[in-house]
Amino acid sequence: MILTTTNTLEGFKIIEYKGIVSGIGVNLQKQTLSFSIKKYNLAIAEGMELAKDLAFKNLEKNANDLHVGAVVGIKVDIEFTASNFVIVSITGTAVNFA
């Protein structure tokens, strides 16, 4: 499975567009400000990484369900809820190529 932020696949020709696919990852560990800003920042970074990994796994699963070889035009959006949960959503276009 090729995952790319570009709209094309260099060296390949896109032969079929199967639609938009997405993946969402949520880190349910609430991030709270502690006495150490360094620890808080590390917790935020770890939470974002966990949510991003989960979102990419979900994106790839959804793309595999469509029997495609690639997802192009990927866009990653990272948000924090009012409760300081990290949410990562990823969207792209599922394609087959030759």
Spans of model-derived segments:
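A generic structural micro-feature
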Residues: 84-86
